[in-house]
Regions:
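Positively charged, amphipathic and often flexible ligand-engagement surfaces
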Residues: 236-237, 247-265, 269-271, 317-321, ...
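Short alpha-helical segments and helix-capping/turn motifs at coil-helix boundaries
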Residues: 2, 47-54, 208-217, 273-276, ...
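CE4/NodB-like, metal-dependent polysaccharide N-deacetylase domain
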Residues: 250-291, 380-399
Length: 577
């Protein structure tokens, strides 16, 4: 296609889509309804609230925000818990948040140490060091680690201040700047009483209750496009066919089982349930789907098309592999092949592909830069793309984690995001837009005969399958699924019990568990997620009315690595290390 020109002979602006993905796995035990880890509510009060606040204050900015449905349900549940606690004194089912609301700290040494350890889980440079009182408290916790007998001599005030400061540090920068109650607490600094902690809990409850409606209002105003991922964030191509892992890595070792039993039925369940949860919270059906971890295959796109999904997206290397296989990969530095949408033959779903260099620059490179310098370089890259010529179908897709990057930035990315939205929305050669609008503007994208299956991470599925520990995770899941299928065939499950079991199975099918397995990741994170995975599988057996296999009481993977961003994020391409 020839370079497009707007009215008056000026070059057409470069379409740029920023897509922020928000996701946490299910941390809640569906039986006890207690939360094993606090990351859902902590990211809500820090990152989800900041991201929506930045968009509200930048009326010219337009972006895509993608939510995993299992995350939406957890945010809603937390909001209800806090409201019920404040209104009726009901218990909070997250130990860390409950400690903030409690009149007194735990009495036992083990419980006190557990609480103190939990309050260390924050970025040292940006969430601890800026606050002298919090920093001093964490130094005392490090001493108590070595001298646990000292826990019995710590005052109630020590634990009250520690848990209060932990939550103050995890608040979004926009909240700290704009909420007078929070400013007063931070000014006080120490000696927090129950009234102070209840005030902070009230702030947290307000954030949890309002954050999703704020995104909805922006979507209804046409300023944001909201999209979804399959319900519990499974790797869809692998559920459909485990051998999809070998399309990009032909020698990848696979689990002993030939296939995941009933995989297509399970994918349809995740899509149907995910769309229903999305519509419940946002009042409309989603037009687009960021598939879990950008995992796409030809069969996946066809299922999305059957479900009426207008667009989806994946990683740069997935497209490169697919074009290379078809003999259609254009050589050269301008990479026009990347900055355009495609459509797999015999589908109605448009596919967009992530610019790894631009996306990973935000995720990994710019955190230590001055905000103006970082945004200046980012915009310069876009200007370079525009200078090479904007075709009628040119779209630059910048897709990344919308929650984990910001703790590595000063002020939770406050200055960077403000500058980014201001520069992009005012730039004469750049048009901030959404994938849905691009689908409308480009009704006939380029055609692909098939996709080489892969994810946004290196264009492969090696993050989730293909080594001993990850394959062991799949084998445990497949065995549980086989037991569930037999229980259904035998008529031992039906009605509400069957629905609970299918929901629990969905949780076990999520991508996060295998993401963490293996020695690449930090030991503490691997231990947390491996233990929770085995627990979720054990609950599934209990819901089936079957004894929990003894193997689920044994640890099968250990971490020990020191990856970038603590393992919470990966680069899209090994070329951008």
């Amino acid at each position: 296609m020839c370079a497009e020109r707007a009215r008056g002979g000026k070059p057409a602006p470069l379409r740029v889509v920023l897509c922020w993905h928000m996701h946490q796995p299910q941390y809640r035990d569906v039986q006890a309804r207690r939360y094993a880890l606090p990351w859902t509510y902590l990211h809500a009060i820090k990152d989800y609230v900041d991201m929506v606040a930045h968009l509200e204050s930048a009326p010219g900015a337009r972006v895509v925000v993608n939510f995993a449905p299992v995350l939406l349900e957890q945010i809603d549940d937390y909001a209800r818990q806090v409201r019920d606690n404040l209104d009726h004194g009901a218990g909070i089912r997250d130990p860390l948040l409950a400690a903030l609301a409690a009149e007194t700290p735990p009495a036992g040494e083990a419980e006190r140490l557990q609480l103190a350890e939990a309050c260390l889980k924050a970025n040292q440079k940006h969430l601890i060091e800026p606050y002298p009182d919090y920093r001093m408290l964490t130094q005392m916790v490090h001493w108590l680690r070595e001298h646990p007998a000292g826990l019995a001599y710590q005052s109630e005030g020590f634990f009250a201040d520690l848990v209060t400061w932990y939550h103050l540090a995890w608040l979004g920068e926009t909240v700290r700047r704009e909420d007078g109650r929070v400013c007063a607490l931070m000014e006080k600094g120490r000696g927090f009483d129950l009234h102070d902690r209840r005030t902070l809990l009230t702030v947290i409850g307000e954030i949890l209750a309002s954050v999703l409606p704020r995104y909805r209002r922006l979507a209804e105003a046409g300023r944001v496009e909201l999209a979804f991922s399959p319900y519990a964030h499974p790797i869809v191509p692998l559920l459909l066919d485990l051998r999809a892992a070998r399309e990009a890595l032909p020698e990848a070792p696979l689990p002993a089982a030939k296939a995941y039993p009933g995989g297509e039925e399970r994918v349809r369940w995740h899509l149907d349930r995910g769309m229903a949860v999305f519509e419940h919270h946002f009042g409309r059906k989603p037009l687009g789907c960021w598939p879990s971890e950008g995992g796409l295959s030809t069969a996946t796109v066809r299922l999305l098309s059957e479900h009426g999904i207008r667009w989806t997206a994946s990683g740069e290397t997935v497209l490169a592999n697919s074009l290379r296989e078809a003999g259609a990969l254009e050589e050269g530095e301008d990479r026009r092949w990347l900055h355009r949408p495609y459509r797999v033959e015999k589908t109605d779903t448009t596919c967009f592909f992530r610019d790894d260099g631009l996306s990973d620059a935000i995720g990994f490179k710019y955190a230590d830069w001055h905000a103006d310098d970082a945004v200046g370089e980012f915009v310069h890259h876009l200007e370079t793309i525009a200078a090479r010529g904007v075709d009628a179908d040119t779209v630059v897709s910048v897709i990344l984690d919308g929650e984990n990057a910001w703790e590595y930035y000063p002020a939770n990315g406050y200055h960077f995001l403000n500058a980014l939205y201001a520069r992009l929305s005012d730039h004469p050669l750049i048009e901030m837009t959404t994938f849905a609008d691009c689908v409308q503007a480009i009704p006939q994208p380029r055609s692909l005969s098939r996709l080489v299956a892969g994810s946004w991470v290196y264009g492969t599925f090696s993050t989730w399958i293909g080594d001993k520990d990850k394959n062991r995770g799949w084998e445990l899941l497949i065995e549980a699924k086989q037991h569930l299928d037999k229980a259904i065939r035998d008529g031992r499950l039906g009605g509400e019990h069957l629905e609970l079991a299918l929901e629990q199975l969905a949780i076990c099918e999520g991508s996060d568990w295998c993401w963490w397995f293996g020695d690449y990741n930090p030991a503490v994170a691997v231990s947390d997620f491996e233990r929770l995975y085995r627990h979720h599988l054990a609950v599934l057996y209990e819901l089936m009315g079957e004894p929990v296999p003894e193997v689920l009481s044994r640890v099968f993977t250990h971490g020990g690595g020191h990856p970038a961003a603590g393992g919470t994020m990966r680069r899209g391409s090994e070329d951008h290390q």
